[in-house]
């Protein structure tokens, strides 16, 4: 199934790119903006930290994956958290944050549906934008029947599966004491992500 995904990913990307019009010009512009940001990273990080702090946030820096994971666990423990709701984040995937927090005694639940599915299956994401693209509807159905203690029920349609995930995840959202999200971009001038 992953081989099929590898075949179709470039096709899906090319179809999406076609919708953008002057793709190459946009690509070059983004490349210049990114390089400018990297060339001036110290300034932008300091500015972001100042603005984020002014917004009531606390900014932490880490030199390694272990240090980042330790900082997050410490924050969770300081707040007496037992349950964590975690949004999709490639950084936390790369640092192994979920496993680290679980070893620290926390229950971590992914909030992105695809990430949730692969988490429940004990697998790793197959694709950055579609973590569970390699799973069939029947595989997800069997997984939910096995993992969710919701009694007898019909899980025949995709909407049945999504509805069940919504019920389980909503319960976790309401019980979680800490939420963790990632950010693809930081707005230095505003201190937002």
PLM regions and their residue ranges:
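The feature marks the mature, well-folded catalytic cores of soluble enzymes
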Residues: 1-193
């Amino acid at each position: 199934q992953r081989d099929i995904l590898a075949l179709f990913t470039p096709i899906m990307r090319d179809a999406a790119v076609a919708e953008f019009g002057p793709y190459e010009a946009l690509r070059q512009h983004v490349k210049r903006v990114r390089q400018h940001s990297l060339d001036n990273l110290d300034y932008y990080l300091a500015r972001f930290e100042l603005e984020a702090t002014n917004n009531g946030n606390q900014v932490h820096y880490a030199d390694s994956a272990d240090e980042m994971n330790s900082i997050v666990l410490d924050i969770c423990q300081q707040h007496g958290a037992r349950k964590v709701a975690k949004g999709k984040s490639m950084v936390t995937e790369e640092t192994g944050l979920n496993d680290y927090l679980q070893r620290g005694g926390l229950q971590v639940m992914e909030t992105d549906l695809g990430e949730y599915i692969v988490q429940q299956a004990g697998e790793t994401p197959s694709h950055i934008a579609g973590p569970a693209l390699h799973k069939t509807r029947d595989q997800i159905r069997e997984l939910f029947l096995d993992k969710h203690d919701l009694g007898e029920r019909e899980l025949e349609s995709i909407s049945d599966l999504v509805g069940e995930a919504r019920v389980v995840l909503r319960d976790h959202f309401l019980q979680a004491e800490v939420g963790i999200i990632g950010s693809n971009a930081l707005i230095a001038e505003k201190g937002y992500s």
